[in-house]
């Protein structure tokens, strides 16, 4: 793995912009997935990718928010993963190139996700056709966008899919969990540096002290059905587990899949890992199920609520 050493270096100079530029530019060399097309669209304050597998219909659509610690990642880094979801779920995908720290606050990224949701509604998609999804920091954004919709009097989506999600910006529990030492992708030092940088950005942009609000601390009642996937060797395993418990307590239909031996956002390695391809198929099945439910009906449970997967 080369990601963990690179993040370890970044932890010592977290305000540097090189990481975002290098990662996104390097990802431009990744070949497109066969049978999938994409085109650039413009949202209010950022761009997005409109991704469609050649077999995709207009029955369902995924609003996708990429990971990258709110600092890096983008349309290039996550195009193949978003394309696989489109292909597997027979769905279109709107992948949002949301604004990043340190120039922008996390709240700006949430606003960009909301703009993506409005874009879909404006083009005639029913909320019962829309699933909001994200990985890592994008998982945080997926929940925060969904929570914001009710405050804006916007209809809730059909479902949420969170892959290796960050759901608690407080790093304390994660750093104390055994998974922090086992994770081959995220070093503890990077998590500590990200927390400190987030606090500085919040103070500079909003004039407030402390971290932004976390999904695990929210009133989750009324959220649509949720699928959580995480690897057993993922630094963010505790976040996925805690979010599962919070959603269960709130009465939200939720399924948690823990993939044994897998690392942070292992889905991006679908070209090499059969487990990643299986996980994406589970995501696709969830999308198909929740988007076929009619308005006012209860969604069937497509997966066991909590299970380990070898």
Where are the language model's segments positioned?
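Alpha/beta hydrolase fold serine-hydrolase catalytic domain that processes acyl esters and thioesters
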Residues: 143-310
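Short beta-strand element of the alpha/beta-hydrolase
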Residues: 59-69
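A glycine/proline-hinged amphipathic helix-loop "lid/cap" segment
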Residues: 1-56, 204, 292-310
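A fold-wide structural signal in alpha/beta-hydrolase
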Residues: 61, 90-94
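Alpha/beta-hydrolase active-site loop signature
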Residues: 69, 98-105, 167, 263
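Proline/glycine-enriched tight loop/beta-turn segments at coil->beta junctions
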Residues: 53-61, 221-223
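Gly/Ala-rich beta-loop-alpha elbow adjacent to hydrolase catalytic centers
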Residues: 134, 138, 142
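Catalytic nucleophile-loop/oxyanion-hole region of alpha/beta-hydrolase
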Residues: 74-75, 81, 94-129, 270-276
């Amino acid at each position: 793995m080369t990601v963990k050493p690179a993040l370890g270096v970044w932890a010592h100079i977290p305000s540097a912009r090189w990481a975002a530029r290098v990662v996104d530019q390097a990802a431009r060399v990744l070949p497109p997935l066969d049978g999938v097309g994409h085109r650039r669209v413009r949202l209010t304050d950022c761009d997005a990718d409109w991704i469609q597998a050649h077999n995709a219909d207009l029955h369902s659509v995924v609003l996708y928010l990429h990971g990258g610690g709110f600092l890096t990642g983008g349309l290039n880094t996550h195009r193949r993963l978003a394309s696989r979801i489109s292909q597997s779920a027979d769905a279109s995908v709107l992948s949002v190139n949301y604004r990043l720290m340190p120039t922008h606050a996390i709240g700006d990224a949430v606003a960009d996700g909301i703009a993506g949701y409005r874009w879909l509604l404006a083009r005639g998609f029913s909320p019962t056709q829309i699933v909001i999804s994200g990985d890592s920091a994008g998982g945080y954004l997926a929940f925060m966008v969904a929570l914001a919709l009710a405050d804006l009097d916007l209809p809730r989506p059909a479902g949420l899919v969170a892959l290796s999600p960050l759901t608690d910006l407080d790093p304390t529990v994660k750093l104390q969990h055994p998974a922090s030492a086992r994770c081959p992708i995220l070093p503890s030092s990077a998590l500590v540096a990200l927390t400190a940088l987030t606090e500085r950005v919040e103070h500079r942009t909003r004039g407030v002290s402390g971290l932004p609000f976390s999904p695990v601390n929210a009133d989750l009642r009324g959220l649509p059905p949720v699928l959580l996937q995480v690897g057993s060797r993922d630094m963010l395993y505790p976040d996925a587990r805690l979010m599962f418990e919070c959603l269960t307590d709130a009465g939200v239909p939720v399924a948690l899949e823990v993939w044994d031996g897998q690392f942070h956002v292992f889905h991006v390695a679908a070209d090499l890992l059969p487990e990643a391809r299986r996980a994406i198929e589970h995501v696709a099945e969830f999308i198909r199920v929740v988007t076929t439910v009619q308005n006012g009906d209860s969604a069937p449970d497509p997966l066991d609520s909590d299970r380990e997967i070898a």
